Amino acid sequence: MVNDTIADMLTRIRNANLAKHQIVQIPLTKVTKSIAQVLLREELINSFEELRNGTQSSLLLSLKYTGKTRTPSIQKIQRISKPGLRIYSGAKKMPRVLGGFGTAIISTSNGLMTDTEARQKNVGGEILCYIT
């Protein structure tokens, strides 16, 4: 049993990118599905699909690679707010990842969204991860 499903998801994506895997399987929870939707909206993955096998459900992510050398579109993915140390940010002090070239996924009262969307909607929340 994994305690931190978000960190588990990010680690699986990181490992699959290093091994140049096309598809990665992740345990399905509401949060992992929401993160996958944000990644799809930001065009960092090709697609995702829910798989239900009896009692266990999983999420299949199709990772995105570019060019002949198959460079992953997700170069670095890093967990920020952890179960032992939560990190929150208001709408005014929302962090910019790599000066705006990266993306932060924020958990707000309006659901999961990127830092740019949170700034536009003027909402703050918990900073889940940074993606570059």
Curated annotation (Swiss-Prot):
Keywords annotated in UniProt: Chloroplast, Plastid, Ribonucleoprotein, Ribosomal protein, RNA-binding, rRNA-binding
Biological-process GO terms, alphabetical: translation
InterPro entries: Ribosomal_uS8, Ribosomal_uS8_CS, Ribosomal_uS8_sf
GO cellular component: chloroplast; ribonucleoprotein complex; ribosome
Self-association state and partner proteins as the record states: Part of the 30S ribosomal subunit.
Domain of life of the organism encoding this protein: Eukaryota
Sections of the chain in a coiled coil: none
Keyword S-adenosyl-L-methionine: no
Function comment: One of the primary rRNA binding proteins, it binds directly to 16S rRNA central domain where it helps coordinate assembly of the platform of the 30S subunit.
Similarity annotation: Belongs to the universal ribosomal protein uS8 family.
GO molecular function: rRNA binding; structural constituent of ribosome
Protein name according to UniProt: Small ribosomal subunit protein uS8c
Subcellular location: Plastid, Chloroplast
Gene from which the chain derives: rps8
